[in-house]
Amino acid sequence: MPKLRSATSTEGRNMAGARALWRATGVKDNDFGKPIIAIANSFTQFVPGHVHLKDMGSLVADAIEEAGGIAKEFNTIAVDDGIAMGHGGMLYSLPSRELIADSVEYMVNAHCADALVCISNCDKITPGMLMAALRLNIPVVFVSGGPMEAGKTKLSDKLIKLDLVDAMVAAADSSVSDEDSAKIERSACPTCGSCSGMFTANSMNCLTEALGLSLPGNGSMLATHADRRELFLEAGRRVMALTKRYYEQDDASALPRNIASFKAFENAMALDIAMGGSSNTVLHLLAAAQEADVAFTMDDIDRMSRQVPHLCKVAPSTAKYHMEDVHRAGGVMGILGELDRAGLLHTDVPHVAADAGGNLKSVLAKYDVMQTQDDKVKQFFMAGPAGIPTTKAFSQDCRWPSLDDDRREGCIRSREFAFSQEGGLAVLSGNLADNGCIVKTAGVDESNLTFIGSARVYESQDDAVAGILGGEVVAGDVVVIRYEGPKGGPGMQEMLYPTSYLKSRGLGKACALITDGRFSGGTSGLSIGHVSPEAAAGGTIALIENGDRIEIDIPKRSIKLAVSDAELAARRETMLARGPMAWKPLSRQRYVSMALKAYAMLATSADKGAVRDRSKLED
């Protein structure tokens, strides 16, 4: 029978000092011997997705202690990608994922916690905590802060739904008046919560449901809705049930590495493809798989992208649906139900929402709105927006008049009526990206599935933005932004501003964009990121010259630089002749701090999840 990890610091005469310190935190004599459950919170006043999390740890703690555990809360950092966007702050976003993972590991291992609840929400926080949870391999439940309500405003007497990207595009569009731009800006982000579309934060919170590590509704229930309170309480109860199963019954199926198995990663990727999730999710799933010692790779993603249809289309890929609409249609469980009926889901995998001996099949039987007989579950998925600006959680209890169970023309479709029979993400490969690259096909217009254009090369995002706004980029160009990968940036910046500016200048369907950086979940258009190897690692993207012909064929999963092998070999020799300046941008002026340099020294390219190069850390 596994011994409580916390016994290391609570048992024996030699631990008198540790027990004295535990007592100073509120632990009583009769508490010693109970499991200690760490609560990793990520409250901050910097981030709308986290501004309401201050008291959530107390909710979880109450449920844990009621179930017989000792709850101890700590906090991690949280970077807002939207606020960090468009300036040097974005260099810190992806590296913060590693810091979050490390900080959770440090706190849990330093204090010998027995289990973990992760309270996350936004872009790098959920994946960072996920990496830590799989690294630690102790019982864990994830519960997020939830998505914000979609913005709404009237323009030309027409009520429209909005999100963050709409505000950015409008501000960059000279045809939009100052008055309308300001109106959109003030309406785009009305409440606390993660941004309202299928951006990175919401994508990752949905994927934790499919991995089996969070409760139904985690990815889609609005931050403002009163029903979300129960998710926090149930997370506390569930983690205690998992803790007892492992430590008292020697049930290893309660551990995250046994829950998040290869099959579970396939389920998560199937969901991601079906819902057209953010391309960043590929980066984070690959990173999490490495922490779990699961051999899930880009090849698996490529294979699945050809098999899984696009069943759910959400902003930024459409203005019609946001996360509140996904929830009304049954949330993640609704999409998983359709994947199951299409024969594209493993249902024999464990899930934290299942009782001992149960699995995803039993969870779907209860929570898939198309098969459940539970009226409470149907009411749960009818939770809707109030339309009242607020930063407070659980501040409203509005309901939709009905569920969206239209699987022909609704927000979630059956396979027969899918938005497309191929999914919302694709892996492209060719001589421009030997190890692959990623495109969010859910955001690509059908007219752009194949594209041939001339390279317009920039060695930084800043230069690309200046070029787009300055009129250098014209229809037919393929904008190439390089040296923005994990090592070359460093930090693998998001390219939301370049894609937004292309869109605002009417070039959204007339140009393509290729980068070894990454894209915000808010990106749409023919935007191809994660080019691997990156420029700083000797990738072919570093050898592209202005005017080179680039051929993109999404149906064939191909991306080609139409330059002969002999010419590429000659360019590579010229690059190597630079000596210490090889594979570095010559014209870019950028301050890189010591913290970022330390990150860059160990960073791998995107096809490896941009994680640390373990070979450099081994003895």
Curated annotation (Swiss-Prot):
GO cellular component annotations of the record: cytosol
Class of enzymatic activity (EC top level): lyase
Active site: 520 (proton acceptor)
Top-rank taxon, per record: Bacteria
InterPro entries, per database record: Dihydro-acid_dehy_C (IPR042096), DihydroxyA_deHydtase (IPR004404), DiOHA_6PGluconate_deHydtase_CS (IPR020558), ILV_EDD_C (IPR056740), ILV_EDD_N (IPR000581), IlvD/EDD_N (IPR037237)
Classification via Pfam families: ILV_EDD_C, ILVD_EDD_N
Cofactor needs: [2Fe-2S] cluster; Mg(2+)
Residues that coordinate or bind [2Fe-2S] cluster: 122, 195
Cofactor binding note: Binds 1 [2Fe-2S] cluster per subunit. This cluster acts as a Lewis acid cofactor.
Residues that coordinate or bind Mg(2+): 81, 123-124, 494
Listed SUPFAM superfamilies: IlvD/EDD N-terminal domain-like (SSF143975), LeuD/IlvD-like (SSF52016)
List of residues that carry N6-carboxylysine: 124
Biological processes annotated in GO: isoleucine biosynthetic process; L-valine biosynthetic process
Reaction(s) catalysed by this chain's protein: (2R)-2,3-dihydroxy-3-methylbutanoate = 3-methyl-2-oxobutanoate + H2O; (2R,3R)-2,3-dihydroxy-3-methylpentanoate = (S)-3-methyl-2-oxopentanoate + H2O
Name of the protein in its database record: Dihydroxy-acid dehydratase
